Amino acid sequence: MSESVAEPHTSNHKWIIGVSLASALAAGIVGFLIYSAVCPCERTPGGFLFGAAADGPVDDWSFANEVPLCQLQIYAGIRPHSINLNCMSTPAGELYLSCSVCEQKYWAARVDANEHAVMRLDGVTYPVVLNRVEEATRMDAAWNARITKLQSFGGGPYNPTPDPNARRPDHWWTFHVTSRS
């Protein structure tokens, strides 16, 4: 008789534990989605980048120079990771990302060749491919585009306006951004 009494108790225990775990998982997912809707915030990374999807691939990224900061979403394993960063377009319309002291940046270590990512500019999301640039001529072109853009949008403690003749530091990296369909 004591065995038949123990079964309902054990069954209730398993049910309560299962419901508790499912509730915690659901709360975690909802919390992450809310966090993704709010961040990246200044220097705090976020999750998914939400926004209106771009109409199609972009050939000329010149409009990026009209937006103070761009937002980038990569995947760190299976988890989305998004950040605010400087992006700039060259006069030819090529888009580059700016990364100072990049060896220490969490996101940069997770970007491989032909890395799929998402960019958000002014609320619109663009599927893109990232590639680190190491050729000095292309890096200089991206650096000059950065200097030009930051004459308008620079300022503040995290994004100072550079001297127009500033030289590209050795610790500065750049990534070329291209549209993907």
Where are these regions (language model features)?
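Short secondary-structure boundary/capping segments
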Residues: 61-62, 87, 165-166
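Short beta-strand segments
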Residues: 66-102, 120, 127-131
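Short, conserved active-site entrance elements at the starts or edges of catalytic domains
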Residues: 35-81
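Short, structured beta-strand-loop surface elements
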Residues: 23, 102-181
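Generic structural hydrophobic/aromatic packing signal, biased to beta-strands
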Residues: 1, 72, 97, 119, ...
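Hydrophobic membrane-insertion alpha-helices, especially the h-region
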Residues: 16-36
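N-terminal Lys/Arg-rich, disordered targeting/topogenic segments
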Residues: 1-14
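Short secondary-structure boundary micro-motifs
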Residues: 8, 55-57, 69-72, 101-103, ...
